[in-house]
Design a protein with these regions (language model features):
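Hinge/lid segment of periplasmic solute-binding proteins
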Residues: 1-54, 78, 107-111, 190-199, ...
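Extracytoplasmic/periplasmic solute-binding protein
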Residues: 40-49, 54, 78-130, 169
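C-terminal capping/gating helix-and-loop segments adjacent to ligand/active sites or protein-protein/ligand interfaces
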Residues: 48, 213, 274-329
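A bilobed periplasmic-binding-protein/Venus flytrap-type ligand-binding module shared by bacterial periplasmic
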Residues: 57-60, 214-227, 312
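Short amphipathic alpha-helical coupling segments at ligand-binding clamshell hinges
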Residues: 137-144, 217, 226-238, 246, ...
Length: 344
């Protein structure tokens, strides 16, 4: 899981992979920054295995019927949502509300960190000793994020596949791997839908910042292993483009395209069975992924944002006050963990 390598590394249980002589060459297999969640102090404790990110899914047929253009900014997204809602249809913005959020990492739980990064903010301070959740940009981003559900009434829980297939939800942000599910299990809408970059914030020069946070898994080597060199050779083999392509193709041949690997290897993704246009769209959005570091006590940040959200959504608490109060709890836990492991 996303958070486990750092949790184990700070307990001195993992091997620092950056100490291997050819690490610098191996890490080039992945998108720039993919290793960030697996860094601790001056070491790197996992190789990216899978990496997931969001894309905008839209129904071409319904967009044409309603006269909607594919939105590039959040303002355009909300304008399109208004047209869709007036037609008694829904818009989907993902929120992970089950137990998997505890190990998924803050970047994969909701779009709040994405909105925060697009607005120029960060989750943690530069030295990673505290959060920046009480900063003005964090509060503005959280207010916007929560307003999607409180003011615009986007559903918090929904079945993306069923609603998108039926046309009940013609626009939604979803993990890019939903692409294969729709291709295989919804042949009746083949050619009637597409993918695009997620909405972003317009910069002063007119360009759009549509960066986003990501999720995924990593592969590790235990520090007490008596076969570190052999384990490293295995990780290099496992994360290579050849192995990832073969593994994914074998899964697809046995279980169908829905099992296509969400590989972190960039060359492997290009060699999998995506259409040329969609491959280019995926790669361009993948380049915009900015991973959030995992820090000691960072699991409280995931919980804090979740609790702050529900206090706004369920209890009507003011978004800024809710996030600020929870950020103090996170900072206290980070400080406690840093003291416990001799970092302060």
């Amino acid at each position: 899981a996303r958070s486990q390598p750092v949790n184990l590394a700070m307990r001195n249980a993992l091997c620092d992979l950056s100490e291997f002589a050819d690490y610098a060459d191996v890490i080039k297999r992945f998108m720039n920054g993919a290793e960030v969640p697996y860094k601790y102090q001056n070491g790197v404790y996992a190789l990216p295995d899978t990496q997931q990110f969001y894309m905008l899914f839209y129904r071409k047929d319904i967009f044409e019927e309603l006269g909607i253009a594919v939105p590039k900014t959040w303002d355009e997204f909300l304008n399109a949502a208004a047209v869709i809602n007036r037609s008694n249809m829904y818009v989907g913005v993902p929120y992970v509300s089950d137990s998997t959020q505890n190990t998924a990492g803050i970047g994969a739980v909701s779009l709040f960190p994405t909105v925060l990064l697009q607005s120029g903010g960060t989750v943690y301070s530069e030295d990673e000793t505290k959060t920046m959740l009480s900063s003005p940009v964090s509060i503005r981003s959280f207010e916007f994020f929560t307003s999607l559900y409180t003011d615009y009434k986007f559903p918090v829980t929904y079945n993306f596949f069923n609603r998108f297939r039926s046309g009940e939800m013609p626009m939604a942000i979803a993990p890019y791997v939903q692409y294969t599910t729709l291709n295989v299990a919804a042949p009746e809408i083949s050619g009637k839908w597409g993918i695009a970059a997620i909405p972003g914030v317009k910069n002063g020069d007119g360009s759009v910042n549509n960066c986003e946070t990501g999720g995924g898994t990593g592969s590790v080597i235990l520090k007490n292993s008596k076969h570190k060199s052999e384990a490293w050779e295995f990780l290099k083999w496992w994360t290579s483009a050849e192995t990832q392509v073969k593994y994914s193709n074998n899964l697809e041949s046995l279980l169908g395209a829905v099992e296509r690997q969400a590989t972190a290897n960039t060359e492997a993704l290009r060699r999998l069975s995506w259409s040329r246009d969609d491959t280019n769209t995926l790669i361009e959005q993948w380049k915009q992924v900015i991973e959030i570091p995992e820090v000691p006590g960072g699991y409280y940040a995931v919980r804090a944002v979740d609790q702050a959200f529900w206090s706004v959504y369920n209890n009507g608490k003011e978004a800024g006050d809710s996030l600020t109060s929870w950020s103090e709890i996170v900072d206290a836990e980070i400080k406690r963990k840093r003291t416990e492991y001799g970092l302060d």
